[in-house]
Amino acid sequence: MSLHHSDLCVPVTVENSPGYNSWPMLQADSRRLVCLYSRGKEHTIVTGDRNLYARISRDGGKSWEAEITVSALPEYSEIPIGKGVDSQGRILFWVRRGTPQPPHFEHVLYRLDEDETFRVIAQPHLQPVPMQITDLFFVPTVGLTALWFATDYQNHGDDSWGMLISRDDGVSWEQRTIEGGLPLSELPTEPAAVYVGDGKILAVARTENRSGGAMQRQWQLESSDCGKSWTRRRTNIGDVCLSTPTLIFDPSTGTVSNYYYQRGEGRLLCRTTGVEAVWQQPEAWPEPEVVAMGSTEFADAGNTNATVSGAQHLIAYYTGVAPQTNIVIIARHAPPPRK
């Protein structure tokens, strides 16, 4: 595989306070850019010393206002896991709360109100209990939706994934299971989804497989009927290792950009193509371009999350060497499709 090196973007630091700053979620609205992230002492998801913070930018990510403590509940590890906007353009964030001994997870949905207060508007009781609920998107005739997956990463053969649907801007939710009883090797995790028109939803998901070869490739998920039925197939994207994808769809050009961080190699990669070029052709993704660089420490960098502001793509990720990791973003003009 040949890599195309674009002019590398220079990351801007959002947060570098002492500690393990990680797992950012990034969302723009018409007035600002909001980055939600968590900070603890190490790469853990169930210790009570991991709290939830935010910073706001009003100049497209060039500078950031003072850190906001969103939540610091001592009994929970709080981690942002998804983002989006409601029908009125208000910013929403999914947050997972975790406790140890035994591990337990619950999910809350925050809304950023006009007074720039983060308010919990939903805490759905879900079964199966997801490990993660990912980014929000609208599907016509259906409502505000998000994909989820459930696993304990122990390969018991009972993993599952599905959809959540809200018809009241996130206050209440309906849970649908798309596939259940899956081994971990067949589970699409941390999916990123976009509605691309004509009832079609395109999603790309991470694989937990680290065996190399054809099994270690991103998943492609497709629905042609607004989420009623789905297909799941492996892509040709194999330069991944526990790499969380994030998608941006441009309806004016019909292009989709797939950003992900190649852990261990320290590269933020992007593949951009027309939706029709990969629809029902998951092995037709073009070669990637290297967009930015970061730490090569395997667990201490990654987890991209992207948003759009005007003609720019903005992508957040974390990078560093434990016990110190930082939140950074890069900004770039929307790329043209590659062949």
Q: PLM features: residue spans?
A:
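Asp-box/BNR beta-propeller blade signature and adjacent active/binding-site loops
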Residues: M1-K339
